[in-house]
Amino acid sequence: MGTKDTTQKRLEDYEDIFADISNVLLYDGKDVIKENELETVTAKDTYTVEQQIHEVERDVAKRWRHHSLHISLIGLENQTDPDYKMPLRVICYDGASYRAQLNADESKKTYPVITLVLYMGTEKHWTAPKQLTDCFKYDERLGKFISNYKINVVELAWLSDEQIMKFKTEFRNFVELLRDTRLGRKPQYSPIQLKHVHELLQLMRVMSGNDEYEQLLNQTTNNLKQNKLKGDDITMKKIVSLGFDEARAEARAAGRTEGMAEGKAEGRAQEKFATAKRMLALGKSLQDIMLITDLPMSKIQELQTEVKPA
C-alpha cells in the first residue's frame, strides 16, 4: 500500500488537492489559487559545501503563476511526529529555493517562498520548536542580531469544524479522519465527491493503521467496475456503506453461532455487544469494530477487557 510519506505526497501532488490545501490555509478557503495556475517544480535542490554536492528534497512543491507572473513557490512538508529541528529543515528548503532564484537569469523577477508544515499527529499537539531561536541556547545579548526564522505548522487534527468544512476536495475527508481519530469516535465523513479514490483510501489506510481501508479499496475497485459506484455516488459515506455491508453481515452471522439467541432476547444493544466481542476475539481493530457496530470507543474498550483473543 505504500509508506506514509509516499501516500501523503501522492494525494497532495494533484493540482486540485494542492490548490484546495493552499486556499484553505493561506486564504481562509477563498478560491484564490486556481489549479491550472500551478506548475510542479522539482522537489530536489542541490547546493555545494566544501566542494561536496548535497541535495535538499521537499515533500511537495509547486510554483504559482498568474498571468505568466510568478506569485510564489509553495511547499508542503508532512510530519506525523514533532521534529525538534524542523525550523532548520525549513530554512534549508526555503534557502535552496531562493538560491535557485539567485542563480537564475537576472531578468527574471524573484518571488517569495512559503512552506506549510502539515502536522498529521492525533495523540498530542506539536511540541517541537516553531522558530529558529527555540532550537538552541544563546547569549540573550546577541538576540537582536539573530535572524529568527519562524515556520508555519498546521495541526490538521485540531482544525475547527468550520475550518475543515472549507476544504472542497476529498482532503476534507482525510482531515475528518484525523479529527475523529483524535476524538476517539467513528469517522463522520462529509458527502464530498471523490476524484482520487485510490490515493485517499491508501492514505487513510497507512495513517489509521486500519487494514479495513485496504479491503475498502479492493471492494471499491470492484464496485466501480460493476457500476455500483458512479458520479455523485462516489463519496466516502457511500463507499463505507457498500464496503462494510458484507463485513457487518459476516460478523453478525458469526456472533449468532456463538450465542446470539441470548443477545436477541436482550435487544439490539446486546446484539451489538455480542458482535463486538466476536470481532475482538478475531483480532479485528477497534476502529473497524466502531465502524461496523456504531458502538462508542469507550464501550468497545470496556468489552475488550472481557474477551480473550482466539
Q: What function would you assign to each model-found segment?
A:
Residues 1-226, 310:
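Conserved single-residue anchors adjacent to enzymatic active/cofactor-binding motifs
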Residues 67-80, 179-310:
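Short, charged alpha-helical interaction segments and adjacent helix-coil junctions
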